[in-house]
Design a protein with these regions (language model features):
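M16/MPP (pitrilysin/insulinase) zinc-metallopeptidase core fold and M16-derived inactive scaffolds
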Residues: 118-146
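Charge-rich, well-structured scaffold segments of protease-associated domains
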Residues: 1-74, 83, 89-94, 99-101, ...
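Short, charged helix-to-loop "capping" segments that act as catalytic/coupling loops
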Residues: 32, 41-43, 86, 121-132
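Short, charged, low-complexity patches
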Residues: 106-110, 129, 133, 171-178
């Protein structure tokens, strides 16, 4: 598992073996309530026996419970721009809005919406054609040769989530890139999607879920993540049923609720001066 570290890189030299030992003691050995054991391709009783033999001796420290260490998240929106030389020379822009988290009813409609928007890069790794009928491919990439990439993005946490669109272009086109993102988001809020693209989005999402779960590596990770987030696991049949239950009206209302919140703007590139100011972007959705 790879985790993104937001701390300053110069602090790496200050880490010592004792720091890692302290971390493991606090969050693993003294906090077994936070542990989830999952497995694929192994019998349930055998897995329970292995977990009991190797982890059964761990004792919970009451002050280490998750309830005592986590504060509720409050979404605020805002902007963050980084003037930084990129390998490709493009400026990357993202605009997103708050939606519900893992435990909300926004989860499945948001996944369908991400499938509908789709998108990708002007260069398709592994062969052309993937996602070419998604909205961002048809309405952004295919109509604007200067767009390097345009893709739906989505992040979920327990209490809140974020959904939006990312795009990249040469620096001088950054303002136009942001406007294209705006137009796509407002279009979703002003009119329902067509039956054809809606049905395609649901089928693509269902196929993606089922295909990924064919891998044992993905399967046991999915079980572990669901146990951590929900305390139980939904099988593929339940997931498919929830996807089929999503309506076009669900997507419309999801986007309308989202854009009522302050936007989140992020940009990174060699020259971010062409990216519109945050207040201007906020007025777009007012």
């Amino acid at each position: 598992m790879i985790l993104y570290c937001t701390g300053p890189l110069d602090q790496i030299d200050n880490l010592h073996a004792t720091d890692l030992q302290t971390f493991m003691e606090k969050h693993v050995r003294n906090n077994p309530k936070a542990l989830v054991v999952s497995g694929a391709g192994i019998g349930h009783d055998e897995l329970v026996d292995m977990a009991t033999r190797n982890l059964g001796h761990l004792q919970q420290e009451e002050q280490n419970t998750l309830e005592n260490g986590i504060k509720s998240s409050i979404y605020q929106g805002g902007d963050y721009k980084v003037q930084h030389t990129t390998e490709d020379g493009f400026t990357h822009v993202a605009i997103g809005f708050e939606i519900g988290g893992w435990l909300s009813t926004d989860l499945v409609p948001a996944c369908v919406l991400q499938s509908l928007l789709g998108g990708g890069s002007s260069f398709s790794a592994g062969g052309p054609g993937k996602g070419m009928y998604s909205r961002l491919y048809r309405q952004v990439l295919n109509r604007n040769q200067w767009v390097e990439s345009a893709e739906a993005c989505m992040v979920f946490h327990n209490e809140v989530g974020l959904i939006g669109i990312t795009g990249s272009s040469i620096p001088k086109k950054s303002a136009l890139m942001a406007q294209l993102i705006r137009d796509q988001l407002l279009s979703l809020a002003n009119q329902q999607v067509t039956d054809e693209e809606f049905d395609r989005a649901r089928k693509m999402l269902t196929n993606s879920v089922l295909m990924q779960l064919e891998s044992r590596l993905v399967l046991f990770e999915d079980m572990g993540r669901q146990a951590l987030a929900y305390g139980y696991r939904e099988n593929s049949h339940e997931m498919s049923r929830k996807i089929d239950a999503v309506t076009k009206e669900d997507l419309l209302q999801l986007v309308r609720r989202a854009i009522c919140k302050p936007p989140s703007l992020a940009a990174v590139g060699d020259d971010v001066s062409y990216v519109p100011a945050y207040e201007g972007i906020r007025q777009w959705f007012a």
